[in-house]
Structure formats: structure tokens, C-alpha cells
Amino acid sequence: MMSNPEDFYTVYNSIMNLDDKVRFVTVLDADGKILFGGQREGIQNYLSDEDQKKSIKHVTEAWFNRKQFSSGIGEGKYAMAEYEKVKRFTFPLKTSSNIVYITTEPEVDHYSFVDNVLKIIESI
């Protein structure tokens, strides 16, 4: 079960190293509590600390609300939202009820990025 800090660090570090357009990577529990993560040095925060907390809460609630449909349409693999200034991704960690929340610059190639993140998560 992926619930120890070494696994979280491996996920964080591997995703951060995929592309220098990755801004933020964090592992969240089902309540939106940050278990591990951080942002790339030198990037500009677009949201205040309070709005970042609200965004994390929203992402967590949205992901776990989608699970109510999994018996009919299958388990979610990831969710993505694209904004003018960032792309936001959410991935489940298969061996726990934790999720990985990632933001990138908008120009990241999300097709290859998603493929690579899924490979990282599946390898842990």
C-alpha cells in the first residue's frame, strides 16, 4: 500500500522531473490533507494561500464524488482541467485512497504527460 513518505517522495520527484513545466505536485488523502509535495522553485503563485486551500478541497471533493459512478462506468484514471494560466491534473493512487494533484504550465503536452504520470504511478 502506498502510504509511506518514501513512496510519496518517489512519485513527487519522478513527476517533477518529467518536465520543467510542472509547477506543483502533491499527494492528498481523501480529506484533502497534504501528505507530501511542493512546488517548483522560482514559480509565481497565481492563488493566495487561502485560495490554494480551497482549490485543493475542491479537487479532492470532485475526485471522490466521481467515484459514485465507478460501478457503472469504471474507475477513473485521471481528471484534467485547463485554464488560461495552468493545467490541473488529478490521478488516483491505486493502492490507497490518496490522490496526486499536479499543476503545470498550460503549454505542457498533456497526452504524453498523462501517459508518463500513469506509468510512474503504476510502477510504485
Question: Each PLM stretch: what is its role?
Answer:
Residues 1-124:
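Non-catalytic interaction/Regulatory regions outside core domains
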